[in-house]
Amino acid sequence: MRVLLILLAFFAPIASQLMGGECGREGACSVNGKCYNGKLIETYWCRCKKGFGGAFCERECDLDCKRGEKCIYDVYGENPTCICQDCEDETPPTERTQKGCEEGYGGPDCKTPLFSGVNPCDSDPCNNGLCYPFYGGFQCICNNGYGGSYCEEGIDHCAQNECAEGSTCVNSVYNYYCDCPIGKSGRYCERTECALMGNICNHGRCIPNRDEDKNFRCVCDSGYEGEFCNKDKNECLIEETCVNNSTCFNLHGDFTCTCKPGYAGKYCEEAIDMCKDYVCQNDGYCAHDSNQMPICYCEQGFTGQRCEIECPSGFGGIHCDLPLQRPHCSRSNGTCYNDGRCINGFCVCEPDYIGDRCEINRKDFKFPDIQSCKYNPCVNNATCIDLKNSGYSCHCPLGFYGLNCEQHLLCTPTTCANGGTCEGVNGVIRCNCPNGFSGDYCEIKDRQLCSRHPCKNGGVCKNTGYCECQYGYTGPTCEEVLVIEKSKETVIRDLCEQRKCMDLASNGICNPECNLEECNFDGGDCSGGQRPFSKCQYPARCADQFANGVCNQECNNEECLYDGLDCQSELFRCPAHIRKHCIERRGDGVCNLECSFIGCGFDGGDCNNGTEAIILSDIRIKVQIDPIEFQATGGETLMQISANLRATVRIQRDELGPLVFRWDGEHEMERVEMNSSKLEDQFVLSHHVRRYRQAVVTGIVLYLEVEEICKPEFCRFSTAQSVVDLIAAGLVKSDGRMSLGLPITEAMVAVPKRNEIDEGWSRSQVILFACIAFLAFGTVVAGVIAKNGPERSRKRKMVNATVWMPPMESTNEKGRRNQSNHSSQCSLLDNSAYYHPNTKRHCSDYSTGYNGEQYSQIYPQTLANGYPGDYNELNFDFQSETFAPADLPADEIPLHVQAAGPDAITAPITNESVNQVDSKYRRRVLHWLAANVRGKPEDVITTEAIRCLKAGADVNARDCDENTALMLAVRAHRVRLSVVLLREGANPTIFNNSERSALHEAVVNKDLRILRHLLTDKRLLKEIDELDRNGMTALMLVARELGKHQVEMAELLLSKGAKLDYDGAARKDSNKYKGRTALHYAAMHDNEEMVIMLVRRSSNKDKQDEDGRTPIMLAAKEGCEKTVQYLALNDASLGIVDSMDMTAAQVAEASYHHELAAFLRQVANERHRNDIMRQQIVKSGHGAKSGRQTVKNIKRAGSRKTPTSAASSRETNHLTPPPSDGSFSSPSPHYYPTTTSTPNRMETSPEYMFNHEMAPPVNAMWYTTPPPYQDPNYRHVPPNTAFQNAEQMNGSFYC
């Protein structure tokens, strides 16, 4: 045991603590350790003080070590152990152990000869473990559950384990144990532990509950609801929450009542004395009306709201026209109305009435010439502003509100912005701002002087004076460390799989149980087709905290949608008494200061005063509101959107008027005839006239523009997509029902498309013209078909690519502009969310446009995070399965009609009738039988097909889409019919207009049974790697799709001769050629099972496509977490760069997958660290492994086994060089060969790497040895951990 501790004292600093870098950099080691530069260049290690351990001495050890010992951790940061303290001198152990020994000798006394070259592992002595040779012997490192000198002892105890579902059984020598997933505990992981799942219930508490599918439930705090208590409860929906005609406003986790004057309290239930501060002049006195409003009773001879107007001498009354010399009311001279009383000849009215005889309702009466600021109506030091023909408006100071600023404001959770705390002192509120913010409401973010307040923890100080923090840090100077709860994300992600959210995704229905960021918001069904948090550094965290009433600074940025505006004060509402006034004056060119703030839409930008502004246009939203209602309330709707976005919002327009269209639930219809003059009077129309327009629950489709008055570097929204994402995130919070307080169902960025048809043409004229054009086109097509004849076996269309030239800057700019002509964010509520549902449009559809719709989509569709995926190039035809273009034939041919119908055929079946051709679809009877969708039984279809074949039907006849009956049978999953057609000579190698054969159709349909039958045809086996129009083989099509039998189908194709790493090289001259293999497509679609199968079959993990991207790069770009982890942990190269000189980590970062980028950098750093350790070990003669090890002496001598070059059986790859003849000293560079490629470090796959695992151990220390074996039989299987090459030294021993 003492020997073991001595060994650990030497080995721990060498193996587990050698890092890349130098001691000179800040924070190389923590304050609990001292840094020493390593023997190798740019390496260092940390010597820890007593009581501390870890690679950087950052962890405090809780073991009570004896005197002369200290505590360390193993290389995994676990298993603390007491070892001897370091020697007093500061000489690194690597130098102490190597001093004085001659070359070829080592050991404490420099007398031990080093490795002689005999390979003792040739006989494979380790039964259930790995054999590692060294001088004079070998060591066996046993697998879990096995022991003994030769790993011969032990059994698999996991065969009959009782571990709960989701846990992992780990075998040991005498038993097994269950490795529990996050949130589970117990011997068999049978218990749910809420404490292990982090803050899984955001605003509530977690309670174990076996009746739930997740085995726990959340009990929400007051004001919150939802499965995970992350949704605000709208208390205002409860009847009479606020009383006395007050207005209820929902807040996050709470609500507030805006009381009518005269009432106070949380529910406005308390009547207050409004006369206390209400002064009536000239001996008038104050009273309350029925609404608790203060009114003044004036002495005769005075009038006015506060008795401030003196009437001419001898006159009185409210108009100063009542003679005071004679009584005005009496029994004979008239009475007082509305319960007024006649006192001393004049009427004294009830508080709600006024007039000389109390005949006027007070609320309908206005005193003459007093609705202006000259009478000082505003109180509490408010600023009064006269309104043109509308009276006045009071701008209240902090802490007051109301018509005349007479009401005191109460503190609410959202009174102060950016996490400030509100406190009320003597009726006046004050915001205490956090560090980095200032202003009355903490609404101003202070700029930092970088020289005085440098950014910490790796943050970067920008020109704006703000710090851009690294992942895991936040705060004005990045001083705060975030606690990222991976356990919570893991639990929810597992829940998504358990609920089969992938099957429910993109079906047009928002399923609340899948409305989580980890479930992609039900495939976009709950987010209007968007991925709103795709750019956010903390997507799951910020989606969870979005609009929850708590300011989270790490989410308070444009990429994370400003935390749902939680960090902004909610006091910005347009006062009711000037709301109409401000709507009428928005954007009229005159600055109305009373309207120039957030709540009233910044007066339409009129108070800009030359300040810079940014205008974001082409924001397309669908709103479930009646078009007629919107015609009347357009200005009010725009005001509401403006207030919620905190920016000016206007409707775009073109030369025909406002861009407002009807929406029938599926398509964008005709333009809504808005009253342009009225809207212009309201100034809710854009100032910019667009010269073209576009078209896609009923309602309207609006095209909006958002104007923000700001300098560009300080604007909240830099792109229109950010506004769309904010709207989409609001949809998420309501399960897809509304956003911005409106019933919005979808938002996207879309440029209205130019309407090429003359607006003056009628609909019937357009249809007539289209029909004529179609008939002419059909005649030409029929002539071509008749000329070429039906005897061709295939139709292949080769597209020759133009010669590529380096794009100029102007060309790139033009390309970016033109990109807007395709689609922004395709709606996931549409069937064409990711691809068109039909494999090919029928020939009759060409006249009506794509899918028969009037409008096209604008920006590239996305596969993952809101950025164009690799399937979205303009020339990529992403297509799926197809169906018959019509239920019934166009011609009334009896045999065709009966073949396509539900009943059996009764018409005569003759050689002439079975070969009769439909004039429109060019189909024959076999086509209609194979494509029958009318419910005809399968056995009847097969029997009738046999009868037609016997009558002489052409089995290989093709319709206008070049489809044979076999292709249609394959699409319809008709196995029996497919077998009959094959037996009768159907050619499965014929290609249709989509350039697909029956093989492609079968794999697209995921039909394993038909695939097995097709692969019995020898003609098809010879063309098993044929490409479709997108340059994809059947294996590639299988690899990209998820499904129950996909892996089995891929294995079947490979067993029948499909090439594993074929990249479509036969189409290199085509613009469809991408240079990708099946592994590329499996990786980019996160098909983990397929990736595992292909990698195990030795598919080239580092094959680069035409863009220089490897499978792991494509997976990183699309955010495929599981695939990236598997490839990275199975030695896929992380140092290769693509044509843009970007590594996999940089590709992930550019696509806003920050966590993936951090993971890839961690793995790359670990590899770099372990490579340095191995080199150090090799130089010092040490290479031990952890585990149960046994050393046996080998007395026989022998010659060294000559290393042989591993012959590669892969396809030749023009971008991926072959191994350098087995040399481990100078591997071929595996990166994209561009003129600017300057990778810091070459990296190769294990097949081409020097095998450091063969470094030979000796009995005492490690010494320099000759080059080790390069025998693939003794390769170490990479473990499933990020520390895949790390070596655990603590606990190892040799005998």
From Swiss-Prot:
S-S bonds: 23-35, 29-46, 48-57, 121-131, 126-140, 142-151, 158-169, 163-178, 180-189, 201-206, 220-229, 236-248, 242-257, 259-268, 275-286, 280-296, 298-307, 329-342, 336-347, 349-358, 373-384, 378-394, 396-405, 411-422, 416-431, 433-442, 450-461, 455-467, 469-478, 496-519, 501-514, 510-526, 536-560, 542-555, 551-567, 582-595, 591-607
GO molecular function, one term: transmembrane signaling receptor activity
Localization annotation: Cell membrane; Cell projection, Axon
Membrane topology: Single-pass type I membrane protein
SMART domains in UniProt: ANK, EGF, EGF_CA, NL, NOD, NODP
Biological processes annotated in GO: cell fate specification; cellularization; cytoplasmic streaming; embryonic pattern specification; maintenance of dauer; negative regulation of stem cell differentiation; nematode larval development; nematode pharyngeal muscle development
Designated name of the protein: Protein glp-1
